[in-house]
Amino acid sequence: EITERLVGSEMCIRDRSAVITLGATRSAIDDVRHVQNTSSGATGWSLAGHLYKHGHDVTCVAGLTTSAAPEWLPLVLTCPTPDSMLKECLAIANDGIDAWIHAAAVLDYVVEAPAEGKLASQQGTLNLALVESPKHIMELQKACKDAVRIGFKLESGVKQADLIHRAYAQIQKAGMSAVIANRLEDMSDRSKPRGYLVDRHGAHFVLADTEALNTAIQTLIERSGEM
């Protein structure tokens, strides 16, 4: 891995500092139960490894993952909840990071009032009040305004044109540099592209596979001075 990194770094215009959020997040129901969304973290780990091997300074802010992290990544911070992940990102933003890639699956809704201890079993229906969780890309907008910012947008049951439109709307609302958009129903279909890169001008580009995704993000980061 070290040899690959040295070779890759020679191709960089300048090594960039990049933060990648990845994995799933959870919200406590009580001390032993949680509401959690689904994300293996595989895309984030793959991207982190790709950027690191090309000479960039990579920090991973990881939620819960089922895909193993490359052992040679230098800095992995574990943040299993939306709140802890946001706090960590806000702290890191003080270091003047060059690029942010928001690949984590952050819960849109969290439990309003987690119970202390363990709720008793077999007590009939359990009703949970869920409240909206802060959008990380919005909360970090001011702190990261001078950085390359790339988000991920997952939708389901929408046409490709609508998917692209929603990704572009996210770029405009949150001040992103680009968004990687894909549909849930396409994720397990190998005949479908890995996703679409939508830029700040509304143009979109097909990403055939994960390698194409990694290379596209690398290019955006390395050309940041030209944007």
What are these regions (language model features)?
Residues 17-81:
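Glycine-rich phosphate/diphosphate-binding loop of Rossmann-like nucleotide-binding domains
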